[in-house]
A protein has these predicted regions:
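Cytosolic, long alpha-helical scaffolding segments
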Residues: 1-196
Length: 196
C-alpha cells in the first residue's frame, strides 16, 4: 500500500502539471504510473480477499477492512488524475483556454488539494493519530469544500455574462469536481488506520 500511496501522489501531481502545461513526456509518465497503480490495486485486493477469508482476530479483521477502503481511495485518486489529464487534452485539442481568473482559481484549488494529500499521506504512513495534523486535515477539507462552492458560483456568473464558453465551463466544473473528490479520498486515507 506504501507504493500505491507514492504512485497515487505522483500521478496526481503530474496530472495537475500536465493540465497547466501539457507535454507528451508527462502524459507517458502518468499513463505508465496508472498501469502500475491498477496492477497493484488488483494484486493487493486479491491478497486482502485471501486474508479476510481466514479466521482473524477482530482487530486484524478491522485493519484488513480499513486497507480495502484505503486501496480503493488510492485507486480513485489515480482515476481522478486520469480525468484531469483528459481535461488537459480537451483543452489542448479544442484549443481552449481559461480566463486568468479561472486559471487562478484552478491553481489555488490544485495547491490546496496537493497540501491536503501530502498531510493525509503523512498521517497514513505514520499510522499514528496526530490530533494537530488531524485538525489541519479536517480544516483543509472544509476550506476546499467552501472554495469549490465559491468557485462554482463565480464560474456560473462568468458563464451567464458570456465571459467563457460552455465548453470551457464543462472543463472547469469537471476539473473542480475531480479536485474535490481527490480531497475527499485523501481525507479518507488520513483517517483510515488512525484508530487501529
Amino acid at each position: 500500500s506504501e507504493r500505491m500511496a507514492v504512485l497515487a501522489r505522483q500521478e496526481f501531481h503530474d496530472s495537475i502539471e500536465y493540465f497547466f502545461k501539457p507535454n507528451s513526456e508527462l502524459l507517458e509518465k502518468v499513463t505508465a504510473n496508472k498501469q502500475v497503480l491498477d496492477y497493484l490495486n488488483k494484486e493487493i485486493t486479491s491478497y486482502l480477499i485471501k486474508i479476510s477469508a481466514l479466521e482473524l482476530p477482530a482487530s486484524d479483521g478491522k485493519a484488513v477492512g480499513a486497507l480495502f477502503h484505503t486501496i480503493n481511495d488510492f485507486q480513485r485518486i489515480g482515476d481522478h488524475a486520469e480525468n484531469i489529464i483528459e481535461a488537459g487534452q480537451t483543452m489542448q485539442q479544442g484549443r481552449l483556454s481559461l480566463s486568468e481568473n479561472t486559471m487562478t482559481e484552478m491553481k489555488e484549488m490544485s495547491l490546496r488539494v496537493e497540501v491536503l494529500l501530502d498531510e493525509a499521506l503523512h498521517m497514513f504512513r505514520t499510522r499514528v493519530y496526530d490530533e494537530e495534523l488531524a485538525g489541519a486535515i479536517n480544516r483543509s477539507e472544509e476550506e476546499i469544500d467552501q472554495c469549490t462552492e465559491q468557485f462554482r458560483e463565480s464560474h456560473v456568473r462568468r458563464l451567464t455574462k458570456h465571459k467563457c464558453t460552455p465548453e470551457q465551463g464543462v472543463v472547469f466544473l469537471d476539473m473542480l469536481g475531480d479536485l474535490e473528490r481527490v480531497a475527499d479520498h485523501a481525507t479518507n486515507i488520513a483517517f483510515s488506520l488512525s484508530n487501529q
